[in-house]
């Protein structure tokens, strides 16, 4: 009876989960290009499998093989003495198998053990492509799921039939799988979500999730601290139907009046923790992220969830608020802020945090509904593949716009540096070890670099030239430069933003060669009648016969004595000119002073006696008469 009740509640939750979502499940698709034979050449769609390791950001070409026996790949190919291992220098093997009779994951595992590089599953129904997923039920041999590393894809029945027909006719079928556009990569920052759960008693899936959190934490924190990513954790919740609100099942699995629920960890209501404990811890983790994100340290969430899993496991009966608060305090976060965010879980009211989580579950645009735990969403596209550090990191790295990837995406275990072989076919200055090859996650680009503040200009493939004021400091701006007899000449000029020009005294292209100009033979200098010319490297020497002196500015020889006499004559003329000017100034000064004094004396005398030439005196005499 207890088991019946448990399954009844599980069925109700699944039904409610689907009915409450107005969105839909989106199949993540990828491009598959058939390059031969001519009859089926073209680009087709295929659906990414939700297991294995898709080569996000990369591509793979191979030859298709359709086995003569074990065509559904439900058995070990070794039993049929079939091997798909590539020959030396041969193309990788893409094995095509039929859908049906066993799990998709088992088909992939058998193909991988036989040496296949990729498995293509041909649909057996004329339907839209679906997502191949791992089995939900746990079996005794389910450990192989974690060991599947080859990519997988589902192709339509029509394409599968066309490939089989071509192989039957003896035509080699070559296919290229391209994952470079599987995820959008619009800019230099990747937004991704992790839909997770605090439950650690759900078997192998919970164990795999905790292992992933611990192993991925370092990379996630590097990306977040560097501002390369914008991470958000999410938690799936359901609500209890109104008809079951008074039931024991809803009361032990839900909070806030049945609005937010989680399944019982052990699927046994009579022992251990219940769904209510899980939903509360999920809410606490969501609030922890909110508080730390507001303080500018969102990466602390990774420390909290991994520390909580270690210090507060259900098996040790520490999965509670007391243990959680200790972890929160150890990370320097205010517990009161977390509690305030959590709010009243017993109130018959909506919780803003969990309400947003329910809304976020519904797919929008190109993203489908979130129905599987765990789920990773990268740039609004659901990740398909293994929950493994390197696989997820590759997917994240493929979400960056090319040339904006962080250093962690360019390590050897993540991608192949294509600049190491023949410099990627790009321009290179071996003298200064400057190259235009820039390694990217998807391959490489040929782009003229910026070195020590100096920008190089060019096509990046055959030519790059330093530009700007500081360009001569880097390999002399790529221009000619030579030193002889203690003298150094350069064709690079700091006052020119680009280009090379041979200095005066040289002629050439300025890049590879500048030849000395013989001014004596070219008759461009030292050509006066008494001049004697001698060419030097980069210049010339000019002398005069006898006691003559060479004036370089005027290209002339003059007499040293004549030059001295001339100089003294100029000096005497200047002295005499200054003397004449002083004498003239003194004469004018004396005349003006004398005139001024005479007028002053006459004015004084006119006050005491009449003067003959005083007009005021004559006017006074006329008035008296």
From Swiss-Prot:
Glycosylation: residue positions: 147, 293, 433
Could you say which residues form the signal peptide? 1-19
Superkingdom as given in the UniProt entry:
Eukaryota
Keywords in alphabetical order = Calcium, Cytoplasmic vesicle, Disulfide bond, EGF-like domain, Glycoprotein, Golgi apparatus, Membrane, Protein transport, Repeat, Signal, Transmembrane, Transmembrane helix, Transport
Q: Which residues lie on this side of the membrane: Cytoplasmic?
A: 589-625
As for subcellular location, the record says: Membrane; Golgi apparatus membrane; Cytoplasmic vesicle, Clathrin-coated vesicle membrane; Prevacuolar compartment membrane
Q: List the disulfide bonds.
A: 419-437, 426-446, 448-464, 472-492, 479-500, 502-514, 544-557
Positions occupied by motif Tyrosine-based internalization motif = 608-611
Query: Which SUPFAM superfamilies does the UniProt entry name for this protein?
Result: PA domain
What is the tissue localization of expression for this protein? Expressed only in flowers.
Give the molecular function GO annotations: calcium ion binding
Q: Where is the PA domain?
A: 55-167
Q: Classify the protein's membrane topology as the record does.
A: Single-pass type I membrane protein
A GO BP entry = protein transport
Classification via InterPro entries: EGF-like_Ca-bd_dom, EGF_Ca-bd_CS, PA_dom_sf, PA_domain, VSR_TRX
Pfam families cross-referenced by the UniProt entry:
PA, VSR_TRX
Membrane spanning segments where?
568-588
**What PANTHER family does this protein map onto?**
PROTEASE-ASSOCIATED DOMAIN-CONTAINING PROTEIN, PROTEASE-ASSOCIATED DOMAIN-CONTAINING PROTEIN 1
UniProt family annotation: Belongs to the VSR (BP-80) family.
Q: Provide the domain comment.
A: The tyrosine-based internalization signal may be involved in trafficking at the TGN.
Q: What is this protein called?
A: Vacuolar-sorting receptor 2
Q: What is the lineage of its organism?
A: Eukaryota, Viridiplantae, Streptophyta, Embryophyta, Tracheophyta
